[in-house]
């Protein structure tokens, strides 16, 4: 979830937003709810994908209900590409949903990425905030 938050913060910053906004209820709070709630349609979509369902299968199974993450994935993929913002989770999610990439292959690609600073420059404030609140960003170093 923290890597996802880092992607969201990078995109928000590229649009001129304060990246700390992403650490609030509308950002991280919503991300926690959508990732952990058994009532989340987005989580349900992810679980179905992990079990091998296709987007067409999922659409039928949702029975007219909307999982907003599907459309959001398509939109953010195009927007991030246009702005040159690195969003590897969003990119892999797009490939799984719309290009049929196997979930295991997408996960492997994400986990095999070279370790680096998730947030730098003005975005480092988000990283520091997460550390102060006890949320790890995958970087074990103490805040500067």
Language model segments and positions:
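Mid-domain beta-loop-alpha active-site segment that forms a flexible
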Residues: 1-7
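NAD(P)-dependent Rossmann-like dehydrogenase/reductase catalytic/cofactor-binding core
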Residues: 2, 13-23, 27, 31-144
């Amino acid at each position: 979830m923290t890597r996802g938050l880092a992607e969201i913060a990078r995109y928000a910053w590229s649009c001129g937003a304060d990246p700390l906004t992403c650490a609030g209820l509308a950002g991280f709070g919503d991300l926690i709810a959508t990732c952990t709630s058994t009532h989340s349609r987005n989580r349900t979509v992810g679980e179905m994908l992990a079990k091998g369902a296709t987007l067409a299968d999922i659409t039928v199974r949702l029975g007219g209900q909307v999982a907003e993450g599907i459309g959001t994935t398509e939109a953010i993929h195009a927007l991030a590409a246009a702005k040159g913002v690195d969003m590897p989770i969003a990119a892999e999610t797009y490939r799984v949903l719309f290009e049929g990439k196997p979930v295991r292959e997408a996960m492997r690609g994400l986990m095999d990425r070279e370790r680096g600073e998730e947030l730098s420059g003005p975005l480092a404030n988000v990283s520091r905030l997460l550390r102060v609140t006890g949320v790890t960003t995958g970087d074990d170093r103490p805040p500067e």
